[in-house]
Amino acid sequence: MRQADVTRNTSETKIQISINLDGTGKAELASGVPFLDHMLDQIARHGMIDLKVVANGDAHIDDHHTVEDVGITLGQAFAKAVGDKVGITRYGHSYVPLDETLSRIVIDFSGRPGLEFNVPFTRARVGDFDVDLSIEFFRGFVNHAGVTLHIDNLRGINAHHQIETVFKAFGRALRMALAVDPRASGSIPSTKGSL
């Protein structure tokens, strides 16, 4: 069973995350940051991952610590649920459009953290959400999941659409990369024999 429960407690946040990589896209989300919950729902639905997130952060300061720490904890949960990576496809990619916007995600469960984030946001905020926090979320995820992730917004005018297509494409790329390949049963997808 590719599932994990991870808790992260710091002086700034308290995060609890449960995931099931072989789920149906169900999500129970209470991060305290409504726009982040909306984006996490995209990951769950498009990744077919069951996801539960409960977070309490120092929102009286701002949402930075909560968003970043949810990314960190989610990355830890993915690393735990994926385990030794035996039989997974390893690579995933997705293009997702939303009206005028088009974004691309490419991911590699390589064990090597790396993030390329190319999203030329058209405004600084979507409602109360600081768009720069999206890079903090993905940086936290990448560093703790041990993945290489390329995020490119290829075109877009509406900043909400830019972020939403990134998160939808991320979910779909995860789904592809984490799919179990029956032909690779018992093997690790690397010529090195380990990831």
UniProtKB/Swiss-Prot annotation:
What's the protein name?
Imidazoleglycerol-phosphate dehydratase
Q: GO terms for CC? A: cytoplasm
Origin, by domain of life? Answer: Bacteria
Among PROSITE patterns, the record links this protein to: IGP_DEHYDRATASE_1 (PS00954), IGP_DEHYDRATASE_2 (PS00955)
Entry's family note: Belongs to the imidazoleglycerol-phosphate dehydratase family.
Keyword tags = Amino-acid biosynthesis, Cytoplasm, Histidine biosynthesis, Lyase
Q: Which reaction does it catalyse?
A: D-erythro-1-(imidazol-4-yl)glycerol 3-phosphate = 3-(imidazol-4-yl)-2-oxopropyl phosphate + H2O
Q: Which GO terms describe its biological process?
A: L-histidine biosynthetic process
What gene, per UniProt, encodes this protein?
Answer: hisB
Where this protein primarily resides, as one coarse class?
cytoplasm
Q: One GO molecular-function annotation for this sequence? A: imidazoleglycerol-phosphate dehydratase activity
Q: In which pathway does it act?
A: Amino-acid biosynthesis; L-histidine biosynthesis; L-histidine from 5-phospho-alpha-D-ribose 1-diphosphate: step 6/9
Q: Tell me where in or outside the cell this protein is found.
A: Cytoplasm
> Which InterPro entries does the protein's record reference?
IGPD_sf, ImidazoleglycerolP_deHydtase, ImidazoleglycerP_deHydtase_CS, Ribosomal_Su5_D2-typ_SF
EC numbers: 4.2.1.19
